[in-house]
Amino acid sequence: MITVGIDVGGSATKIAAFREDGRLMSPLFVRATDPVTSVYGALGRFTAENNVRLEDIHSIMVTGAGGAYVGEELYGRPCVHVSEFESVGRGGLYLSELNRAIVVSMGTGTALVYAQSGEKSEYLGGTGVGGGTLVGLSRLLLGMEDLSHVADMALSGDLSHVDLMVSDITRRGDKLGLRQDMTAANFGKVSDIASKADLSLGLFNMVFETIGMLSLFAARSKGVRDVVLTGRLSVIEPAAKIFENLNNMFDLNLVVPFHSQFGTVIGAALTGMERTENRI
């Protein structure tokens, strides 16, 4: 039998599943403005692409903001609603193979969860800064809405045309415990010659630095170094370099595991697997 997880978001629905032997099946996502349409579309596409019969599905674990639109069954298969934050924590630990970490879900907004194997995940808080911020400000500053295009453009950007750095304020930052290449103020030095590429990189840097610093504070509060980054923003092109810089600046281990964009839905499916095993 197969245990399915479905994460119903505002603009896309993600689906992941585990076989009875614990093997993860290839996750996928479906875009749709209507959550009900996207749920049925995702499940239909999943069964078709994996040659899965509905009767092979033991249960469907539903999570996400749009999960309220899903009833007690889909195509006749039972649905169980599970905590999104619990799913974030379980998925992050599973993908990273860590026993204890801060798990960050980077979606339209950002949520931070403290997860430890065998324990209930703890929601630490979050911020409205996330993918929605990037979409909105890209529209206002650049006249662009497709984040993949904005991300591609950001790769050729120059932050020195946008951000105020510690080196712009003092040459003695090291004596204060500050690296010269640290950001003093995002968008604090926007040049008249700043290009769209520069502004694009500035936007990504502002959002990712905000998420990174919140992750640092959360990690220090729990006495851990490992931070697992999940959600669709975790795999967008400028993320890797920006988070690598934060790793080098602070005593952190920011991790982006394989399938990180599916962390929450994988965590939901894992919850179903564990419930099934406990009943055996």
Set out the residue ranges of the language-model regions.
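Short beta-strand-loop/turn "lid" adjacent to the catalytic site in phosphate-handling enzymes
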Residues: 29-32, 47-84, 96, 120-123
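Glycine-rich phosphate-binding loop plus the immediately following alpha-helix
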Residues: 119-174
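Conserved phosphate-binding catalytic cores of ATP/NTP-utilizing and phosphoryl-transfer enzymes
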Residues: 70-104, 109, 113-119, 266-272
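Glycine-rich phosphate-binding/hydrolytic loop that grips phosphoryl groups
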Residues: 90-95, 134-138, 254-280
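Conserved phosphate-binding/catalytic loops in two-lobed NTP-binding clefts
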Residues: 79-85, 244-267
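Short glycine-rich, Thr/Ser-proximal phosphate-binding strand/loop in the N-terminal lobe
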Residues: 2-41, 121
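Glycine-rich phosphate-binding loops at beta-strand->alpha-helix junctions
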Residues: 62-70, 217-246, 261
